[in-house]
């Protein structure tokens, strides 16, 4: 691939954004500053008008260590990277590009500078540009990414410690002359090819010790002799896996790392001197150079002029890089053969992980053991003739990289065995339970769980023994086995809880059915104010006073029966006493919810008003013996009405609150339910409705929980009931008045005189006499049974219905004939009718009023 240097002239002739696809060259390889190009690029990227709202990051490190690759992955830039077919300088000079990663978590307007790598063979011993470019990056950037390999940590020249020392010295000389201002920067050490064998904290400690020694060794201006490196620099660290050997892991970690390039705040609780470093946003306000974006080009050019004119700086040549370079090449060569064997397994494992279907890979253990042995022997035969220290270090690095990947495969294999084993265990237990339920025979849940758990553990150990690589630090899988057994126990407990939940649900449905019937019967009995219908046949106290006592007793007995059922069945689950206590506690709470829902259903305003009216009519329309009353003018209708109404009105306050007649207080619901068991979890409580007087956080007292009808509803209910009762009373009065007849006395004499012949004819004729006798006996029996009233009402109803039907048929006849239609037309507007009014024939009562009005009263 072409190097960045090959594109150096693009910005000189093009002005569109595509001309800067690979960024803009700020300083070329000849140390010349490209001010016009930089200014134009910032304008095209819309950075110039952003004021202080921009950030600058630089990266430096040894050549061919993947700095450009790192920036491209972090910021989506297109810096040219080194070809895998050759090793030579890629980035020439200093290049800049704007962040192309559009993640919302990153700061806006991030500018990234790719600095030419140090220790390149192209420049050889001439390291002046390396020094000056590093100083320029430090002088202009908020964050300086130091790109080093893990194996370079602890080295002096390999880790560019000499260059950092020079940076510290010149930084004090050039930028700290203003004693009133402290310029701070962040040195972000990105440790490449991080294997994880050495903890990152240890690498941090080593690097910070090196930083402290470097700072102590530099000459400081007057007044700064006692200064500390932490006075001017902050430090952060991050380890990245090998891009070639762990590409997916590398991409994943770079994505995580990119999220840290956002605005942050200093944590006052962290002390860098104690090895405490931030892992939050890297852009702190004190890092910013406070140079407006539109003046950055001129500022950067001035800084470069100061640096390029300082001719006293130089860096020594690093002596051991050859051995390190060759060992790296050999390591990569042996890893190629290693990859040929291992990568297919890694691909299968990663693909299965992405699909969420972990797979146990056959033959993995043998392939792992063989590939590791071959890689170590091949490296030993080729690299052992080089520098012993480098060889030993690189061999350890090879083993670390190989073991890291093999350990990942091993753990992935165990993870697959873990997940598949858990899934199979759960399915096997569920299938066994369903089989027992279908057969209709009892099954021992605890025995099923123990048997399936033993099978699952045996299978897991078999997979682990076949995959493990002896002699490695991770060959002991006892911890994974313990975790597996622990999760099996957790799944067993969850399955047991689920089974107990299903048992509880069945018991709750049984309670709901029983309470629905029993409580429904008690409420239905309210419709009768006489003996019978659920009321006691004997006793002076009305049955309504004991209403809530009966409801509570039925409720308690039903729940006790349900608890016995639940406890007996739970014993086969091997459930602990704590789990049974939680189940019984939930059952009581759920049962109260069922009872309260049933009460609320029965106490709906319409239902309650209907029951009150039925209760009133039962007391008003029937006598104490249960015989319907036939109202006569001489009856004390007002007295009976008043007693029946007042008796029914006493039900409203009685039903408004759930109170026991024995104690004149609400039932002891809080004591009956009991306290929340200590073993209850949030999952046990999340589906439970709060109960007043039981749950403190509910904010309701027990008295409020037992209030069925509010005071406002009681008043409204009383008014509506009285209106309905008044309608019944008016109907009774009309019935009594309608039965009155006033026959004049002279009518009887006239009847006797005019009908004497007919009377004699009837008495002399046996047939007529017998018929008269039968009619007289029937009339007497009807009178004794108080049936004349119903017969008269039925006759009136039949006659009224006949009249209504006759009117209907007459109207239909008139509408179907020509003469009738003409007569109807005359009554319409424009005809000879009275002003076009239309009158509908209505059925009238005995007082000449519309019968519909009486029906409206009856409906109340």
Curated annotation (Swiss-Prot):
Cooperates with the reticulon proteins and tubule-shaping DP1 family proteins to generate and maintain the structure of the tubular endoplasmic reticulum network. Has GTPase activity, which is required for its function in ER organization. One of its GO terms (cellular component) is endoplasmic reticulum membrane. The lineage of its organism: Eukaryota, Fungi, Dikarya, Ascomycota, Pezizomycotina. Residues 818-860 are annotated as: Disordered. Its EC number is 3.6.5.-. One of its GO terms (molecular function) is GTP binding. PANTHER family: PROTEIN SEY1. Residues 764-766 are lumenal. This is Protein sey1. InterPro entries: G_GB1_RHD3_dom, P-loop_NTPase, RHD3/Sey1, Sey1/RHD3-like_3HB. HAMAP family: Sey1. Belongs to the TRAFAC class dynamin-like GTPase superfamily. GB1/RHD3 GTPase family. RHD3 subfamily. Residues 443-501 form a coiled coil. Residues 1-742, 788-860 are cytoplasmic. It is a multi-pass membrane protein. The chain crosses the membrane at residues 743-763, 767-787. It comes from Aspergillus oryzae (strain ATCC 42149 / RIB 40). Keywords: Coiled coil, Endoplasmic reticulum, GTP-binding, Hydrolase, Membrane, Nucleotide-binding, Transmembrane, Transmembrane helix. One of its GO terms (biological process) is endoplasmic reticulum membrane fusion. Its main location: endoplasmic reticulum. It is found in: Endoplasmic reticulum membrane. It comes from the Eukaryota. Pfam families: RHD3_GTPase, Sey1_3HB.
């Amino acid at each position: 691939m072409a190097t960045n240097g090959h594109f150096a002239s693009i910005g000189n002739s093009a002005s569109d954004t595509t001309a800067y696809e690979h960024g803009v060259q700020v300083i070329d390889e000849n140390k010349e500053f490209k001010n016009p190009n930089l200014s134009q690029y910032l304008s095209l990227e819309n950075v110039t008008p952003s004021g202080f709202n921009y950030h600058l990051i630089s990266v430096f490190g040894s050549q061919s260590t993947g700095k450009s690759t790192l920036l491209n992955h972090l910021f989506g830039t297109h810096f040219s990277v080194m070809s895998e077919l050759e090793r030579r300088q890629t980035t020439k000079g200093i290049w800049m590009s704007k962040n192309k990663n559009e993640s919302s978590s990153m700061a806006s307007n991030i500018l990234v500078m790719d600095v030419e790598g140090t220790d390149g063979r192209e420049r050889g011993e001439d390291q002046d540009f390396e020094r000056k470019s590093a100083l320029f990056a430090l002088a202009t950037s908020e964050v300086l990414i130091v790109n080093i390999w893990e194996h370079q940590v602890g080295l002096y020249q390999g880790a560019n410690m000499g260059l950092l020392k020079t940076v510290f010295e010149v930084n004090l000389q050039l930028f700290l002359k203003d004693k009133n201002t402290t310029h701070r920067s962040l040195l972000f050490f990105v440790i490449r090819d991080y294997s994880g064998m050495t903890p990152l904290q240890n690498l941090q400690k080593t690097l910070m010790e090196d930083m402290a020694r470097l700072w102590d060794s530099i000459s400081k201006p007057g007044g700064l002799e006692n200064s500390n490196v932490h006075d001017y620099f902050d430090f952060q660290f991050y380890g990245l896996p090998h891009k070639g050997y762990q590409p997916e892991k590398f991409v994943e970690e770079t994505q995580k790392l990119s999220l840290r390039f956002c605005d942050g705040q200093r944590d006052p609780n962290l002390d860098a001197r104690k090895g405490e470093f931030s892992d939050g946003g890297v852009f702190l306000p004190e890092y910013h150079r406070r140079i407006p974006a539109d003046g950055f080009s001129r500022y950067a050019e001035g800084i470069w002029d100061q640096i390029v004119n300082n001719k006293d700086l130089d860096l020594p040549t690093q002596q051991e890089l050859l051995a390190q370079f060759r060992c790296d090449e050999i390591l990569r060569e042996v890893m190629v053969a290693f990859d040929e064997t291992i990568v297919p397994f890694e691909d299968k494992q990663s693909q299965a992980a992405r699909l969420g279907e972990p797979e146990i890979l056959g033959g993995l253990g043998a392939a792992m053991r063989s590939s590791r042995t071959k890689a170590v022997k091949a490296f030993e035969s080729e690299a052992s003739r080089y520098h012993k220290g480098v060889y030993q270090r690189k061999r350890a690095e090879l083993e670390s990289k190989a073991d890291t990947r093999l350990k990942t495969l091993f753990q992935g294999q165990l993870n697959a065995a873990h997940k598949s084993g858990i899934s199979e265990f759960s399915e096997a237990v569920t299938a066994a339970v369903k089989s027992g339920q279908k057969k209709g025979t009892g099954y021992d849940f605890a025995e099923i769980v123990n048997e399936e758990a033993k099978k699952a553990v045996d299978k897991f150990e078999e997979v682990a023994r076949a995959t493990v690589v002896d002699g490695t630090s991770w060959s002991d899988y006892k911890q994974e086995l313990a975790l597996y057994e622990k999760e099996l126990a957790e799944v067993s407990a969850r399955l047991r809880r689920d089974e107990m939940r299903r048992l509880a649900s069945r018991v709750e449905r049984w309670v709901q059915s029983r309470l629905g019937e029993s409580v429904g019967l008690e409420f239905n009995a309210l419709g009768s104010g006489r003996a019978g219908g659920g009321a006691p046949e004997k006793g002076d106290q009305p049955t309504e006073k004991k209403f809530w006592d009966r409801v509570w007793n039925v409720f308690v007995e039903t729940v006790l029966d349900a608890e016995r059922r639940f406890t007996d069945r739970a014993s086969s689950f091997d459930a602990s006493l704590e789990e049974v206590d939680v189940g019984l506690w939930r059952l009581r709470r759920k049962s109260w919810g069922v009872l309260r829902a049933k009460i609320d259903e029965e106490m709906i305003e319409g239902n309650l008003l209907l029951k009150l009216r039925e209760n009133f009519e039962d007391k008003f329309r029937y006598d104490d013996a249960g015989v319907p009353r036939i109202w006569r003018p001489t009856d004390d209708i007002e007295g009976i009405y008043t007693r029946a109404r007042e008796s029914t009105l006493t039900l409203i306050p009685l039903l408004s609150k759930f109170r026991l007649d024995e104690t004149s207080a609400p039932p002891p619901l809080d004591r009956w339910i009991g306290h929340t068991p200590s073993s209850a979890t949030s999952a046990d409580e999340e589906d439970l409705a709060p109960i007043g007087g039981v749950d403190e956080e509910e904010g309701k007292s027990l008295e409020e929980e037992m209030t069925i009808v509010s005071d406002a509803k009681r008043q409204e209910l009383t008014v509506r009931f009285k209106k309905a009762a008044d309608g019944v009373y008016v109907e009774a009065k009309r019935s009594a008045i309608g039965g009155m007849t006033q026959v004049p006395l002279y009518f009887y004499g006239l009847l006797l005189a005019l009908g004497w012949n007919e009377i004699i004819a009837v008495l002399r004729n046996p047939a007529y006499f017998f018929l008269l006798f039968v009619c007289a006996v029937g009339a007497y029996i009807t009178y004794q049974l108080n049936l004349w009233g119903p017969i008269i009402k039925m006759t009136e109803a039949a006659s009224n219905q006949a009249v209504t039907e006759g009117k209907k048929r007459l109207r239909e006849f008139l509408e179907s004939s020509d003469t009738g239609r003409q007569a109807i037309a005359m009554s319409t507007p424009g005809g000879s009718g009275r002003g076009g009014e239309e009158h509908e024939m209505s059925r009238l009562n005995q007082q000449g009023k519309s019968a519909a009005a009486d029906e409206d009263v009856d409906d109340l």
